[in-house]
């Protein structure tokens, strides 16, 4: 990795010669130019470094994989998963081995790199183990869209994953224990907008807020002083409640002398960096302080899950929730929705009450 005026550039070097490995490095640069988030590029760099080390251990190169038959290719990539699962990718003693989902995610990144290689015309054929699949989805107005994907029949079995959420009553307790209005506004906006923490910390008070309509905008910028940025180089917006807007205005008035000295809505209100843009590390430190005071564990991502579940219970369509969260596919949104067994029984009771006569059972008794 190389830093250039706070920008990160990832590239690969040969262990012995120190020469740059061209194609993997070009792939990471392609991701950077495509406005992929730095964290995503970093994960891609690690995934590819693990795979390249695996190839070295097997005394193979990238071109060798294309020469393999189907069964050989399949064994090669499943062996990579087993190698990852055993913690062989790390030089440190792993106290906690990677789960199946993490191992699969590394391999999916490897497959994306192979696809990039093929698009660069380095190979006239594709990997034999990847098959084309199609998924049909509908947007909020019913228009169908066909998604083409590559699938691999060798991934490790994944458990059904549902991310952690937080309940409304716990959010209320956290708000009551906040040390200042900035922290209260930050929690409220996370809960009411569903924005990622990087998106919210990038909000500029003079450009990204419609004070008349009470709308907060997410604008993609890759030069924010605090390193915050929107994930998918996208533009989104969210309306906040009148009550939250009132607290927002109270916060701006309360700290206006600090806020007007720079561009960002959220700033450090005390300490050595007072008046400087608030960073993600500061948010997590604030949440840890609240956890010590209340015993309630919270994270920005848990508040995104709360947003999604609260809207689902209020009757929002899945497509609308997905768009509000900035997801590129519905599958990701579905993982946010914590549907309980009690809810399933409740909606089943309501269904049968509306449709008791659907099978004509009364006539059978």
Where does each model-flagged region fall?
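Basic, Lys/Arg- and aromatic-enriched nucleic-acid-binding interface segment
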Residues: 164-197
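N-terminal core-binding DNA-recognition domain of tyrosine recombinases/integrases
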Residues: 24-39, 48-141, 173
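Active-site/catalytic core of tyrosine-dependent DNA strand-transfer enzymes
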Residues: 241-295
